């Protein structure tokens, strides 16, 4: 289903006309690693051994992690950006629901500030809608980028603390469960 959904949305997600999203497979690992390491160079091992380790890690993930889909943005057939889409189940209101997450969004340095990251997020939103995800989560790399798109730091949380002496008396505690 993931592959069909991604192919269906590949050009029809609201992105730029000459851009397409495709599933990334191990045959594109060199381009993938180039974009990934140049987008996030801090704290990365850029030695030959380090790069070889990244390649091994990501090829293994591409082949074996069924919940992770590696996708790339192509402009005029050139690989310019990447991200991972995570499909998982989440307990929402006591029921397991299909959910999705966006992770490791990276744009090749030569294509930054050209709307590629925005197109990737638009694709992710379209994917979440198309797969009827109950929850879509972002792993933000820059909060200000997502703020411009209307995302916030989190939803409003109201917390109330009520002393137990103010609760009504209840003798039957058989339905109460202690959670640790």
PLM features: residue spans?
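Short glycine-biased active-site loop of nucleotidyltransferases that positions the nucleotide triphosphate
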Residues: 62-64, 93-95, 152
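Active-site/acyl-donor-binding loops of N-acyltransferases
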Residues: 1-2, 87, 150-171
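Alpha-helical/coil-rich non-catalytic "connector" segments in signaling and regulatory proteins
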Residues: 43, 98, 115-116
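Conserved acetyl-CoA-binding loop-helix of GNAT-fold acetyltransferases
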Residues: 104-107, 113-126
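A conserved beta-turn-beta hairpin within the catalytic core of GNAT-like acetyltransferases
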Residues: 89-102, 112
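Short amphipathic alpha-helix that is part of the acyltransferase structural core
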Residues: 2-81, 85-87, 101, 168-180
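Short, solvent-exposed loop/edge-beta patches enriched in aromatic
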Residues: 64-65, 74-79, 107-113, 129-133
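Conserved active-site alpha-helix within GNAT-family acetyltransferase domains
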Residues: 130-134, 140-159
